[in-house]
Regions:
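Active-site neighborhoods and metal-handling regions in enzymes and metal-associated proteins
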Residues: 1-220
Length: 220
């Protein structure tokens, strides 16, 4: 038997370990955070305030982005999309944060259906104004860790789409048995790689500022 914290490995890694262990009649246990039980001075999760990325920088509203992702879900035949890659989440919702140093992301998860956006986040980090904007786009806020229980309640007749390289194994294992899981790249990851005119113009401005700073450094 092999044990690990399923939140710390990807679906792809977990499935690979399962395959190897099955050949040896072994099992993989992934539901316990053993280190957490003895880590008495473990730092608290970051709760930096979430802020909105204005559409003048994003070039596209969150409503339009959500609609585009839902179109990809339809093409794949999925009714549910589980999203856990932080850069894709902040792109989709037009938000930013400071939960990870040097990365403007928010510790969060998203479950996207055809009519709702379930946003799992430390709610005290979401200012009222940001909450209101997200709710206008159909988002429902939930406590960060609640996703692990909510995934268990998914209708097994639904098809669930997720990226196996970015989704953690514990989340995947909580999906009801018998549910069809569609493994494919997150549509948000593909979309955000294709910059719109507003983003391209802002990239030029950013490069000018970066070049100015580098020139000053070289001169110094």
């Amino acid at each position: 038997c092999m044990g690990c914290d399923g939140r710390s490995i990807s679906v792809a890694e977990g499935r690979k370990y399962e395959e190897l262990l099955n050949k040896k009649e072994g099992t993989l246990k992934c539901q316990d955070d053993l280190a957490g039980k003895i880590w008495s001075d473990r730092p608290q999760m970051s709760k930096e305030p979430v802020y909105v990325l204005n559409v003048k920088y994003a070039g596209e509203t969150r409503e339009d982005k959500i609609s585009r992702v839902r179109e990809e879900m339809k093409k794949a035949g999925a009714q549910v999309h589980v999203l856990s890659s932080l850069d894709d989440i902040v792109w989709l919702l037009n938000i930013r944060g400071n939960d990870i140093e040097y990365n403007p992301v928010v510790l969060s998860y998203v479950i996207l259906t055809m009519d709702q956006v379930h946003f799992y986040v430390q709610e005290e980090a979401v200012p009222d104004q940001v909450r209101e904007e997200l709710e206008k786009a159909g988002a429902v806020l939930h406590p960060y860790f609640q996703i692990y229980e909510d995934v268990k309640k998914l209708d097994p007749s639904y098809k669930v789409m997720l990226e196996e390289q970015c989704t953690n194994y514990a989340l995947y294992k909580n999906i009801p048995e018998g549910t069809e899981v569609i493994f494919q790249p997150n549509p948000a990851a593909v979309f955000k790689g294709n910059k719109n005119p507003v983003e391209m113009e802002n990239l030029k401005i950013a490069h000018v500022k970066d070049s100015r700073a580098m020139s000053r450094f070289i001169y110094w």
